[in-house]
């Protein structure tokens, strides 16, 4: 834990030390009226919902510019990526303005908005809007590595799990009822799964490499109060990746509810995993928006939508393996985010092995073309 994270987590938001600190940050990065603000005029309120950041809404009773303060919990490499991405999107009007960054945190524009939850992303019209916004981000050229960071992260997490003393991992699902999985997996087994899926993906979908969010859970989608426009936030995993991985990541997360107020703090819905209700309209919206953005006319829109659905289905299990490996490592680190990470890891591994045969079938079909 960094010194500034410790400072903001151990002290009350209305403590004198915190009030003076946010005034200092306001003066340093925003200037203007913040130079004349007294601590009695400041309000700091915690914003709930962030798993990788501590967030605070800082306002005053004066005309000083309000701001959102993020105190990071992620590794420096992810913080760097997220900040670069935010700066790029900010300049293009695709997200909140970046006011400033410092060691351990950053300040950005506070957007009056509604944060989506899992119920919101399952509303068909919202799913259509989300599908339509993806091509806009996928078309952006971002000056970061074009390598598929998701695969590197999976290997890093697995190596971290092993270095922390992790070994064979028993798969005992809690919130899903799948049984078509091995009883346990070894580190060697998991490395093989990563290698094998990377091989399949590279062979049949390498041409789909785009800049991706890679973590579009419902809480990373804002609906602006003023226009009802959607804005995607929290880009710490934003890198180039296979398009289908990015889309499948969002669709996969619509089947998972983190609002469970008691252990294990997570519920995976098998019905939504096996029969995602909005995948058709989501992919239709993507194809239509992509067509308009690129000013093109697909010769067979129906076939294009069908192919995109297949692309999402192919990557769906990999998104669960991705987060399973993260949860395995962070469980050993005693990372706390309100979710039993071992339950999440076991359930996601069960989902991975349940859906993997479909991906293999898609690979075998497309590799013959």
Curated annotation (Swiss-Prot):
Q: What does this protein do?
A: Catalyzes the first step in phosphatidylcholine biosynthesis. Phosphorylates choline.
Q: Does the keyword Protein transport apply?
A: no
Record's catalysed reaction(s): choline + ATP = phosphocholine + ADP + H(+)
Q: What Gene Ontology molecular-function terms does this entry list?
A: ATP binding; choline kinase activity; ethanolamine kinase activity
| Broadest EC class assigned to this enzyme | transferase
> What is the species listed in this Swiss-Prot or TrEMBL entry?
Caenorhabditis elegans
Pathway recorded for this protein: Phospholipid metabolism; phosphatidylcholine biosynthesis; phosphocholine from choline: step 1/1
One Gene Ontology CC term in the entry: cytoplasm
State the name under which the record lists this protein: Choline kinase B2
* Protein family according to the UniProt entry: Belongs to the choline/ethanolamine kinase family.
Characterize the pH dependence.
Optimum pH is 10.
């Amino acid at each position: 834990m960094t010194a500034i994270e410790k400072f903001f987590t151990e002290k009350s938001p209305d403590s004198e030390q915190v009030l003076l600190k946010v005034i200092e940050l306001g003066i340093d990065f925003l200037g203007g009226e913040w130079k004349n603000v007294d601590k009695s005029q400041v309000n700091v309120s915690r914003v709930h919902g962030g798993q990788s950041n501590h967030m605070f809404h800082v306002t005053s009773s004066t005309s000083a510019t309000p701001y959102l303060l993020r105190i990071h919990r992620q590794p420096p490499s992810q913080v760097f990526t997220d900040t670069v991405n935010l700066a790029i999107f900010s300049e293009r009007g695709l997200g909140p303005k970046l006011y400033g960054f410092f060691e351990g945190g950053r300040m950005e524009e506070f957007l009056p908005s509604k944060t989506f939850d899992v119920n919101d992303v399952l509303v068909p019209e919202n799913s259509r809007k989300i599908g339509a916004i993806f091509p806009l981000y996928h078309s952006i050229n971002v000056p970061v590595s074009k390598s598929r960071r998701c695969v590197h992260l999976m290997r890093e997490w697995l190596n971290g799990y092993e270095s922390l003393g992790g070994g064979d991992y028993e798969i005992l699902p809690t919130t899903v009822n799948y049984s078509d999985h091995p009883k346990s997996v070894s580190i060697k087994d998991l490395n093989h799964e990563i290698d094998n899926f990377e091989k399949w993906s590279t062979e049949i979908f390498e041409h789909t490499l785009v800049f991706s969010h890679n973590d579009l859970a419902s809480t990373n989608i804002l609906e602006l109060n003023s226009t009802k426009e959607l804005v995607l936030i929290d880009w710490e995993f934003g890198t180039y990746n296979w398009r289908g991985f990015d889309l499948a990541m969002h669709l996969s997360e619509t089947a998972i509810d983190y609002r469970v107020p008691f252990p294990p703090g997570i519920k995976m819905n098998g019905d939504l995993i096996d029969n995602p209700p909005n995948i058709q309209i989501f992919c239709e919206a993507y194809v239509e928006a992509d067509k308009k953005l690129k000013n093109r006319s697909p010769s067979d829109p129906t076939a294009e939508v069908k192919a995109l659905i297949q692309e999402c289905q192919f990557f769906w299990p990999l998104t669960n393996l991705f987060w399973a490996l993260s949860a395995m490592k962070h469980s050993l680190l005693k990372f706390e985010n309100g979710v039993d990470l071992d339950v999440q890891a076991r359930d996601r591994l069960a989902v991975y092995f349940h859906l993997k045969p479909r991906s293999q079938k898609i690979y075998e079909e497309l590799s013959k073309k």
